[in-house]
């Protein structure tokens, strides 16, 4: 027998105290015996209930007269059933399933209450029947599962491109600053886009360039000087158009297909003060007008696959395509014909390029691709790897390996009639060479310090060097660095560049560094006189010390047609500069560079002149850029 003590609240609001004894007979029936306690006993039982952790029993007693010595107590089973149901519904096992509980129906023993001889201390005995009552499993939701017929027909909503049509935006094909289908703002059909871009570039250039007096004739008879009139001026008008037809979402993943065509139209006019400066024919005199249509891009790009849920990918591009081997265009930046496999890994942190290219012949006077000529007999195989946030956050690192194989042994004249291959210097003989370029490039910042760095080594072999008929080993190197720091609207930078030169043009080593097709964005770029203008090597052959848009002293006829020359004097450049954003629309750039030869031996041999100073001079430049629509 288990004695359970509890304090109960009577239906009339009075407090009474009792003890409940529970017994079970042999038939399994349970009987309950309730004994009324005296006030003192009730107080004791009340305190014991705090420490004994009782099991709650929901039993309500009805008391007719609290002060009477005898009371009729009735167990109200109906009222207590509600309380039992509440307690039962909240009991749960550890796994969340309901457990079965005992549902008790109480039957009053009227005979016990009807006996007037019984006192308050006598017991009142009631017999209750206990039976197991299963509890239904709870459903997950009281809401019934919808049936197929409960669904309405779907409402079609325009995609994120065409939904603007319902908002009243008009498509203006002539307005590039508003919604425009031919600008790629929304699909042309399905998920195919069409994008048209046009860029107009107008150049008026007044310059002074060292110009030799004509060999056969001159514009001013009677001159005996080597150098003629330096004054020149040129006007160039270029219109570049680009047509892109592509399929894809264009925002979070690369297009599935891309077809790109970039024709460029050029008209140029040049006037000089010396004969034979523009054309090998003296009858052409001192002016030249030329036009050309070049194809700078014509390729198809196929998205092969996605390799991660972040849309890292592999793509294949075939055709005439722009390519740059590094961040600043030191080694190879051109639009050759080729096949390129490229893609990304690790959420775009790693990028790679694998490619094979053949350069196109260039138009001599515009520098654009000439698709009417055969491809050059020069194979370029490229493999490079870009790694973001390496070695630190905010800095890009790149490793490059390029193999160059040149087999151009035929004589080639440019459109103005001057010989371009082989170069008119030294023995003027056909050459072949195989060179491997290995390099590291970095671009980014370390804290507030911005940094661009590039380093290359060129290793290989050339058959018949420029000044010697013997084969020669190519061993040359290159290094450039440009740190800068920002002070609000002002950026201050320093530049240093070194390209190795050849110490002895007649030994079996070619140590002058030369690029494949350079276009350096460095030390002022095309705002620098030395980089922008082609400086001729007067009296040393029909070559230039450095080509237009080039910084290396390669001693080629020009970089568009000429072969690489690894027997050159090299270059040393040290400079400082500043870029000032005076207004959002107005930028002022200042540059001051010092230039020198790394070695003077190749220049001395070419000119048959000794004791040539290694200092080239100072290059001072300023550029004012106004962008009226920049905000």
Describe every region a protein language model picked out.
Residues 142-149, 178-187, 212-214, 218-364, ...:
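Outer-membrane beta-barrel channel domains
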Residues 211-213, 225-232, 272-276, 284-290, ...:
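Extracellular/periplasm-exposed beta-strand and loop segments of Gram-negative cell-envelope proteins
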Residues 168-196, 207-211, 246-259, 304-314, ...:
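Short loop/turn motifs that connect adjacent beta-strands in outer-membrane beta-barrel proteins
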Residues 1-46:
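N-terminal secretory signal peptides that target proteins for export/translocation
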Residues 310-312, 321-510, 572-576, 582-584, ...:
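Signature for the C-terminal beta-barrel architecture of outer-membrane proteins
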Residues 503-607, 615:
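C-terminal structural cap/anchor segments
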Residues 65-255, 488, 492, 504, ...:
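N-terminal periplasmic/intermembrane-space "pro-region" immediately following the signal or transit peptide
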Residues 49-62:
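Bacterial N-terminal signal peptides
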